[in-house]
Amino acid sequence: MTTEISNGEAKGHHLSTIPSSITLSAEQFEKLYLSPMMRQQPSLARKVGNPTPLALGGFVITTTPLSCCLMAWRGSSGNGIAFIGPIIFLGGLLLLITSILEFILGNTFPCVVFGTIGGFWFAFAATMIPSFNAAAPYSSSATSTTAGLTSASFMNTYAFLFITMAVLMLIFLLCATRTNVVYTLIFLSLLLVFLLLSAGYWRLGEGDAAVGDRCIKGAGASLFVASLLGFYLLIAQLFDAVGLPITLPVGDMERFWPRSQK
């Protein structure tokens, strides 16, 4: 208690205490960090900021315009070559930074998710940059990246990367069932994205433009759904972060899996 002298009178004021750390419940932890709470909450997580919204922000800023491009809205084309900058600095870099921060906090699952998806964005952008010379050898002149990106041999080859990413998304999908419904649906949407992209590239490689283009547009639609779910999850986390009296449900899936403590 402190004492203040005003006009010869003493006035007492009680000091207020501001908590320096907050302990989260298992459900709150899984909603904010997108990772099952497998052990006691680390002390560092109670003192520092939550990095997960940073990755979600980078994800939605990248996937939303790219999905519109894949669906050819407003005459857009190029399979995302116009978004090389955002793909590198928003999709790749922000997810990589978040992956490192999640590693420091001990959150293995989001660390792996954000790190691998961020790495994919870097690789995807690098393929379209002429200085990497990834697509140019597939062109008839062996020097044109633009022509190489649309060549049959390149598409037939690059589709294997999408198939591999689809397998990875399936693994993430299974792991995400320990967290919440929204996060699980994001990986389900991404699984469809990579399956449709691989199918589209193989059909285009075979010269079947009609089916190939439909598959690419279907991949764009699935990616758009994933971006909308990402926006929802981002809003839910930021509302909690600033203490708004609005709680958006994300569908906690604890009822399907028993919690294990380590």
Curated annotation (Swiss-Prot):
<dbReference type="GO" id="GO:0019413">
    <property type="term" value="P:acetate biosynthetic process"/>
</dbReference>
<dbReference type="GO" id="GO:0030428">
    <property type="term" value="C:cell septum"/>
</dbReference>
<dbReference type="GO" id="GO:0015123">
    <property type="term" value="F:acetate transmembrane transporter activity"/>
</dbReference>
<keyword id="KW-0812">Transmembrane</keyword>
<dbReference type="GO" id="GO:0005886">
    <property type="term" value="C:plasma membrane"/>
</dbReference>
<dbReference type="InterPro" id="IPR000791">
    <property type="entry name" value="Gpr1/Fun34/SatP-like"/>
</dbReference>
<feature type="transmembrane region" description="Helical">
    <location>
        <begin position="81"/>
        <end position="101"/>
    </location>
</feature>
<feature type="transmembrane region" description="Helical">
    <location>
        <begin position="181"/>
        <end position="201"/>
    </location>
</feature>
<keyword id="KW-1003">Cell membrane</keyword>
<dbReference type="GO" id="GO:0006068">
    <property type="term" value="P:ethanol catabolic process"/>
</dbReference>
<feature type="transmembrane region" description="Helical">
    <location>
        <begin position="219"/>
        <end position="239"/>
    </location>
</feature>
<comment type="similarity">
    <text>Belongs to the acetate uptake transporter (AceTr) (TC 2.A.96) family.</text>
</comment>
<keyword id="KW-0472">Membrane</keyword>
<keyword id="KW-1133">Transmembrane helix</keyword>
<feature type="transmembrane region" description="Helical">
    <location>
        <begin position="53"/>
        <end position="73"/>
    </location>
</feature>
<feature type="transmembrane region" description="Helical">
    <location>
        <begin position="154"/>
        <end position="174"/>
    </location>
</feature>
<dbReference type="InterPro" id="IPR051633">
    <property type="entry name" value="AceTr"/>
</dbReference>
<dbReference type="Pfam" id="PF01184">
    <property type="entry name" value="Gpr1_Fun34_YaaH"/>
</dbReference>
<feature type="transmembrane region" description="Helical">
    <location>
        <begin position="109"/>
        <end position="129"/>
    </location>
</feature>
<protein>
    <recommendedName>
        <fullName>Protein alcS</fullName>
    </recommendedName>
</protein>
